[in-house]
Amino acid sequence: ADAAPWLGAMAFRTRVIGAIGDNKYASNVGYMVDNKGNEVYLPVVGEYTSRERGGLHSYDFNVALNFYDRIYLGATIGAYSVDYSRRSFYKESYPGDASTYSLENWFDTSGTGVDFKLGVIIRPFESSSFRIGAAIHTPTWFNLEDRASAIMTSDVDMNSDGTIDKDELYEYDTMDFPGESKTKYELITPWKYNLSLGYTIGRSVALGAEYEYSDYSSAKLKYDDGVKMEDETSQIKTGLKGVHTLRVGAEFKLAPEFSFRVGYNYMTAAMYDDTFKRIALNSISTSTEFSNLKATNNYTVGLGYKGSVFYADL
């Protein structure tokens, strides 16, 4: 039998889509047939809600070396724990007596990861505060487990003459197949490279600039048995690209205890304009939402206070 993603199977079982030929399917919602047999497409009222919690937690273990106050070396082992969950609900309604359907998703990811970071800062001129820095971050090796479940409900009814009416509710729940709702896999993130410059003017002004590059298209996915996730990795390679990040900032000492900070951060887009989320045939995912973020510009300002026993930043 031909493979089909969970989402397609759910839509077929709840009659949201129907077969129109060999391996061909069409939507059964969003239109009505008038008394002349013509299909009349209807305006849709969509409803979407989503709630997320958790995320990525990091724990760093550092060591640093100082050579003559001119060369500074640092190394970090990073450990990560992942605990993320999302609940979403989507519904399409149509005016009049047309059919409706809804999709409710539950998604959880958990796991651990580790990476390594190496960095160096050099003051090339003994009499100057000017400094140059460079750092390299290895990929983060994650071991993750996804758990997904969903319920799709519709009131679509297909008549014997091919017309569609609104009828009793049909429901398809993936929790009826609990053994199929988990995926264990490995994620290997891209390498990251960093260059920085810094300069201090007297005791009142500190200036800094930083450039970072990471090729997101080089990320890789593998199942926990080591087999490469071909479809997903191919989507990463063709849909993502290298990301350039530029950060500049300045700190001004207004008084011995008070400082004022300004900063700017520019990051290029990680995705091509036409990149979208495509669910693999063997994926347990049934959520279609995604964001294709463009280049971002962020501006920051801040105030700081540092006393003998207390400090605060805003």
Located regions from the model:
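Outer-membrane beta-barrel porins/channels
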Residues: A1-L314
